[in-house]
Regions:
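NAD(P)-binding Rossmann-fold cofactor-contacting core
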Residues: 148-177
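Glycine-rich adenosine-cofactor-binding loop
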Residues: 16, 105-110, 126-147, 157, ...
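Adenosine-phosphate binding glycine-rich loop
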Residues: 228-230, 234-290
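Residues at the starts of beta-strands that form the adenosine-phosphate
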Residues: 11, 128, 151-152, 180
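Rossmann-like adenosine-cofactor binding region
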Residues: 179-254
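Short helix-loop-beta connector
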Residues: 122-128, 225-227
Length: 290
């Protein structure tokens, strides 16, 4: 617990519902303490009904900014003054920066995923990846990957409302980037096999593998995976999902969602404080090296 908090400290929030399970306050405050910077990070239970008032409160109280999570990532965009290209493309914001009363919306989820790959020595720039999922995390990853220079992205999802939304995002990316992006029904297993065979990275950005779907995997046939494929899962609890277990048995390099969570948080800290987050220190303090 920091004992030097005074009137010069600035508050950074997290607006989501539910929120009590989040690891972000522990991670962020661990970093601020280590860096000895005058910031405190607190979680606030804010649903969509309370969001407009919460943004007014952020402005009125002069918060340095706020993280934004479900169910507010899309709705919050209409209350902000500026949006980054990634937010405009994805339609979702997970980070607000308050700069002298001007609120700018960022999305660091995709940044965190791409940085995780880079730190793990995985080069996907100019190459192809396959991603399963079409929700907020998947959309952020697809958008950032396209903006960063990934050549081709194959998206697989069930034909639900998210499918239609990600089709619209894919259309924007095809029109505004050099990346070829397309969406296919997840039930088409032969097409999924073909796209994975042509990809250097496979990403699971669905909830399959975490509670209440723990122990399940969208990939059930191990022969769809090869040893030189990098398999990533946005889930970090459990640390090793069924998909990652299958991939590891096939000799694949595997990455869980901890790296994405840490690096997206580091990107937020850079936005809010201008400082580089001591990621290795955080991993040690929070037991992520175990």
């Amino acid at each position: 617990m920091r004992d030097n908090i005074d009137g010069h400290f600035l508050l950074i929030g997290l607006m989501a519902y539910p929120i009590r399970h989040s690891l972000s306050p522990q991670m962020q405050n661990t970093i601020y303490s280590k860096l000895d910077v005058p910031y405190v990070y607190l979680a606030f239970e804010v649903d969509q009904e309370k969001l407009p008032d919460a943004i007014k409160g952020l402005r009125a109280l002069g918060l340095r900014g706020s993280a934004v999570s479900m169910p507010n990532k899309q709705l919050v965009c209409q209350y902000l003054d500026k949006l980054t290209p990634a937010v405009k493309m994805s339609g979702a914001c997970n980070t607000i920066s308050n700069d002298n009363g001007v609120l700018t919306g960022y999305n660091t989820d995709g940044i965190g995923y791409m940085r995780m790959l880079k730190e793990a020595g995985v080069d996907v720039i100019g190459k192809k990846m396959t991603i399963m999922g079409a929700g907020g995390a998947a959309t952020a990853i697809v958008v950032q990957a396209a903006l960063d220079g990934v050549k081709e992205i194959a998206i697989f999802n069930q034909k639900d409302e998210c499918y239609q939304k990600i089709e619209a995002v894919a259309k924007k990316l095809n029109q505004n980037t050099q990346c070829k992006v397309y969406v296919t029904d997840l039930d088409d297993k032969e097409q999924l096999r073909k796209e994975i065979a042509e990809s250097v990275v496979l990403c699971n950005a669905t909830g399959v593998g975490m509670k209440p779907l723990e122990g399940q995997s969208l990939i059930t046939d191990p022969t769809m995976l090869r040893a030189d494929l990098v398999v990533t899962d946005c889930i970090y609890s459990p640390r090793k999902t069924k998909l990652l277990e299958i991939a590891e048995q096939q000799g694949c390099k595997i990455l869980n969602g901890i790296g994405m969570m840490l690096w997206q948080g580091a990107a937020q800290i850079k936005i809010w404080t201008g400082e580089e987050a001591p990621i290795e220190y955080v991993k040690e303090k929070m037991g992520f090296n175990d």
